[in-house]
Regions:
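Short S/T/G/P-rich N-terminal loop/turn motif that feeds into the first structured element of a domain
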Residues: 1-55, 64-72, 94-118
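Mid-chain, well-packed structural core segment of small domains
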Residues: 58-90
Length: 118
């Protein structure tokens, strides 16, 4: 499994656009499934969070090769989907993610790089 991903976070639906938000969520899941089937991403998870007092209601985590993820992120389909999501949900954000063993490697490397600052 790859150690790189895209984190797509989102908040509550915009008032009056709840039905459209559900539709765009479904579009996103279908799009990610197509990307996986085509080999553009390795896998994806759609996550809804329980109420916690914050503004993050859920997220999608796409895993894949960083070069392929960059190509996905630059595609017209991706830009269209993010624009649609921003229209129906608050706080939509897309962030590159470093996962699993690569995250651990970076934490260890940061410890070594900052040891003299302690």
């Amino acid at each position: 499994m790859t150690n790189f991903g895209l984190f797509v976070g989102f908040g509550a639906p915009v008032d009056g656009r709840e039905t459209q938000a559900a539709r765009v969520f479904g579009e996103a899941m279908a799009y990610y499934a197509r990307l996986q089937q085509q080999g553009d991403i390795e896998s994806f998870d759609g996550v809804l969070l329980e109420a916690h007092g914050g503004d993050l209601n859920g997220f999608m985590l796409l895993r894949g090769d960083p070069v392929k993820l960059g190509m996905v992120r630059a595609s017209e389909d991706w830009v269209r989907l993010v624009a649609r999501a921003e229209f129906v949900a608050r706080g939509v954000g897309v962030v590159s993610a470093i996962l699993d063993e690569e995250a651990q490697r970076l934490v260890s490397a940061n410890e070594a790089m900052t040891a003299d600052l302690r």
